[in-house]
């Protein structure tokens, strides 16, 4: 599960971010532009509820629209995290999304699931209606 946060949407980075995942060879299975309410944001970030930055994070996520996405492909969670970069943009390498587009940890452009199990939970939360089932005609060009 990948979410472009309000700063990424406001700054017009949606196309660039989608392009990076597509160019890597991943398939887009779900996409929605949505503004979430506080209760939904709190549910999404429930694992961080005891952290001192929790309320600020929730306020930030509800401050504008986000783009929620589901990507599929071999190693998509681990590779997605590498494409995104470190949580703290100052620790992110150039060439990563956060390394190229973010400065502050509190405005780091994008969220990516940290594990396959987290991705399953987040996809169920954000896409209760399910995702598109299709396979790119380029699949055989990307995978053995």
From Swiss-Prot:
SUPFAM superfamilies: Nucleoside diphosphate kinase, NDK
Matching SMART domains: NDK
EC number(s) recorded for this UniProt protein: 2.7.4.6
Active site: 111 (pros-phosphohistidine intermediate)
CC cofactor: Mg(2+)
Molecular function terms, GO-annotated: ATP binding; metal ion binding; nucleoside diphosphate kinase activity
Catalytic activities: a 2'-deoxyribonucleoside 5'-diphosphate + ATP = a 2'-deoxyribonucleoside 5'-triphosphate + ADP; a ribonucleoside 5'-diphosphate + ATP = a ribonucleoside 5'-triphosphate + ADP
UniProt enzyme class: transferase
Entry keyword set: ATP-binding, Kinase, Magnesium, Metal-binding, Nucleotide metabolism, Nucleotide-binding, Phosphoprotein, Transferase
Pfam families: NDK
Binding site for ATP: 5, 53, 81, 87, 98, 108
Domain of life: Eukaryota
GO BP terms in the entry: CTP biosynthetic process; GTP biosynthetic process; UTP biosynthetic process
InterPro entries, per the entry: NDK-like_dom (IPR034907), NDK-like_dom_sf (IPR036850), Nucleoside_diP_kinase (IPR001564), Nucleoside_diP_kinase_AS (IPR023005)
PANTHER family: NUCLEOSIDE DIPHOSPHATE KINASE
Family from the record: Belongs to the NDK family.
Chain's role: Major role in the synthesis of nucleoside triphosphates other than ATP. The ATP gamma phosphate is transferred to the NDP beta phosphate via a ping-pong mechanism, using a phosphorylated active-site intermediate.
Listed HAMAP family: NDP_kinase
Protein name: Nucleoside diphosphate kinase
Taxonomic path: Eukaryota, Viridiplantae, Streptophyta, Embryophyta, Tracheophyta
């Amino acid at each position: 599960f990948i979410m472009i946060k309000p700063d990424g949407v406001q700054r017009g980075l949606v196309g660039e971010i989608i392009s990076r995942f597509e160019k890597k060879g991943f398939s887009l299975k779900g996409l929605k532009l949505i503004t979430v309410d506080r209760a939904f944001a709190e549910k999404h970030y429930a694992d961080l509820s005891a952290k001192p930055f929790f309320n600020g994070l929730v306020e930030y996520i509800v401050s504008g629209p986000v783009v929620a996405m589901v990507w599929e492909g071999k190693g998509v969670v681990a590779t997605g995290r590498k494409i995104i970069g470190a949580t703290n943009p100052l620790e992110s390498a150039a060439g990563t999304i956060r390394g190229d587009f973010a400065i502050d940890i509190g405005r780091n452009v994008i969220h990516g699931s940290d594990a396959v199990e987290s991705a399953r939970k987040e996809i169920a939360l954000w896409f209760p209606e399910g995702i598109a089932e299709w396979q790119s005609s380029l699949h055989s060009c990307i995978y053995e």
